[in-house]
Amino acid sequence: MESVGHSLLTLSVLCPVGALLLCWVGSVLLGAGLLPSLTLSTRDPSTTLSRTPWLVVLVPLLVLWGWRWLSRPMELLRSPEEVGYIPERGRSRAQTANLVRRRRMKGELPPIYPNGWYRALDSHLLPPGTVQDCTLLGEQLAVYRTLEGKVYVVDAYCPHLGANLAVGGKVVGDCIECPFHGWQFRGEDGKCTRIPYAEKVPDFAKIKTRPSCELNGMVFVWYHCDGIEPTWSVPEQEEITKKEWVYHGRTEHYVNAHIEEIPENAADIAHLDFLHTPGILSGVDLRYTKSRIWDFVKHSWKVQWIPEPAPNKHCSQMLLAHSILLFGKHFPLLDVNVVARQVGPGIVFLHFKHAFLGEGVIVHCVTPVEPLLQKVSHSIYYQKNIPALIPKFILKAECIQFERDVMIWNNKKYISKPMLVKEDAAIQKHRRWFSQFYSNNSPQITFQQEGLDW
């Protein structure tokens, strides 16, 4: 990913320089008679456009610009109010979103923060010697990287007088230094190692640290309500580590729903044939997705959801066969098989393989920001020998389908005891599987007339 960034930076510098160089070379070659002049015939034969090297400059410049545009990773970051709401007359998007959130019935909710690993941020956003602020599970964290490349995660607020270590804090060795009084805390165990104006550092001077890991181009943080150390690991996608698959972009959305509702979609097989059958040209507004204008393109889905046995009982799989119908006709060459492997409550690897479009993975991560606000990211990695346009199209198509779900989630009520038919059996099975990520002390919220009661 870093090499892609360097390539784009280099190209952005070289494009204007290359254009000037091509212009100069073209002028020299034309002056020497080594290139043919371009003649523009008009009614007046004496009018000619000659000795102009525009073609020599324009064509390579357009090629360079096109290559740069196609190679650049697609970054589509949506704000919380941007997707999933029907605008109300006389109100802005933000006002509409806030109104819907206030008046929506919440239902009888499960615990709000399941135990597990969660994505904090992407690795390329944390260069050596820097610190980033991160909101995770209702808390503020400081994520920093030492000059040697090691990543640590600590509470953002200094236990001395509460300064935010991620706002002006400095990385010193393997410690982070508070911008307020210069206290330094070691990332490994949180121990304060230096107070500039104190003769001795007291033993009680510590900051809370969080278990973390870095792989697949991301930094993950472990959460357990009882402070238990990690009981399972985030799997490594070897093709990403070996750079056989390269990064082509990500999307990021905010969803106003309980975290469990998002992965539950994998077991809600019936919704695929109803919500996601219309082609992507039908858009994301559910009022219009079934318009007959785009009815000639339809998606077909065959899905199976299964939990994995021990020792991987924290994992489950959705096996999906996708096909496209054009004017009611099936084209087998467009079929795609997807294996979506859920690891814990907040990480999914959507591995897809196509006969001639190649192979790749979308890493789907759900991170609770606060009780009913989830940050959902989709990062795509694809075979490096496949044109970048292919994975970017796949990511955009995934984004459109996902935003249809967002419109449902942002406006729905959670029902703890849903009215199910036998064809919905996988939903109840998924809820039993997901319950393993809650424990007796998992935080809960209840909603009363007077407000929010924690």
UniProtKB/Swiss-Prot annotation:
Membrane topology reported for the UniProt record: Multi-pass membrane protein
UniProt-listed CDD domains: Rieske_RO_Alpha_N
Protein name per the record: Cholesterol 7-desaturase nvd
GO molecular function terms noted in the UniProt entry: 2 iron, 2 sulfur cluster binding; cholesterol 7-desaturase (NAD(P)H) activity; metal ion binding; oxidoreductase activity
Chain residues that bind [2Fe-2S] cluster: 158, 160, 178, 181
Catalytic activity: cholesterol + NADPH + O2 + H(+) = 7-dehydrocholesterol + NADP(+) + 2 H2O; cholesterol + NADH + O2 + H(+) = 7-dehydrocholesterol + NAD(+) + 2 H2O
Entry-linked PROSITE patterns: RIESKE
Domain named Rieske: residues: 117-221
GO annotations of cellular component type: cytoplasm; membrane
Highest taxon listed in the record's lineage: Eukaryota
Function: Catalyzes the production of 7-dehydrocholesterol (7-DHC or cholesta-5,7-dien-3beta-ol) by inserting a double bond (desaturating) at the C7-C8 single bond of cholesterol. This reaction is the first step in the synthesis of the steroid hormone Delta(7)-dafachronic acid.
Lineage: Eukaryota, Metazoa, Chordata, Craniata, Vertebrata
Annotated compartments: Membrane
